Amino acid sequence: MFIVIEGCEGSGKSSLTELLKNRLITEGKSVIATREPGGSPLGEQVRNWILNPSLPGISPYTELFLFLASRAQHITEKIIPALESGKIVICDRFHDSTIVYQGIAEGLGKEYVTNLCHHVVGEKKFLPDLTCLLDIPVDTGIKRKQQQKSLDKFEDKPLVYHNKIREGFLSLAEANPENYLILDGRQPLEASLNKVMTAYTELALCK
């Protein structure tokens, strides 16, 4: 099973990813947790380069295709082999982050970016089984990030940009309710974890 954790900056994605991995392992499941951008040696290099606020700016199209190149490698090198071996894969960000950040907030076009993402490794769409969206008010999420570390180039964008991100995620979730679980990022992560586990159990019974 392939589970993706999505959300705005400071929503708790990385923490929920780790909690979910640990809970599934305690239940005897074979699990890997990964992230985007990243997840492979190539992907981590792309991540370090793109997110570095001190590097010269690159065009949104260049960013888009770097993210897609990283994802294609990540899917073929790590995600597909893990799924084929029977592991559960949990990924911190995936297609929808690219659709929302590059397609909507950067203005490259939602449909254009969606098509590129869904077919990044071939004609057949490569999609998660479940996407969990941690929704949180933009100002709350950014304040959390500011308390944790210095901001990267995307985190440091103006609030109007982050509001586009939040609205974009919610629009994707509302358009695909059968594949999305919306979680309140202001609530304790343990509460969100329990909801994800319920959704996971229901999905596993259907497979």
UniProtKB/Swiss-Prot annotation:
Signal peptide: none annotated. This is Thymidylate kinase. Its EC number is 2.7.4.9. Disulfide bonds: none annotated. ATP binds at G7, C8, E9, G10, S11, G12, K13, S14. Pfam families: Thymidylate_kin (PF02223). Keywords: ATP-binding, Kinase, Nucleotide biosynthesis, Nucleotide-binding, Transferase. PROSITE patterns: THYMIDYLATE_KINASE. GO terms for biological process: dTDP biosynthetic process; dTTP biosynthetic process; dUDP biosynthetic process. Belongs to the thymidylate kinase family. One of its GO terms (cellular component) is cytosol. InterPro entries: P-loop_NTPase, Thymidylate_kin-like_dom, Thymidylate_kin_CS, Thymidylate_kinase. Gene3D superfamilies: P-loop containing nucleotide triphosphate hydrolases (3.40.50.300). It comes from the Bacteria. GO terms for molecular function: ATP binding; dTMP kinase activity. It is an enzyme of class 2 (transferase). The keyword Ion transport does not apply. Phosphorylation of dTMP to form dTDP in both de novo and salvage pathways of dTTP synthesis. The keyword Transferase applies. It catalyses: dTMP + ATP = dTDP + ADP. The gene is tmk.
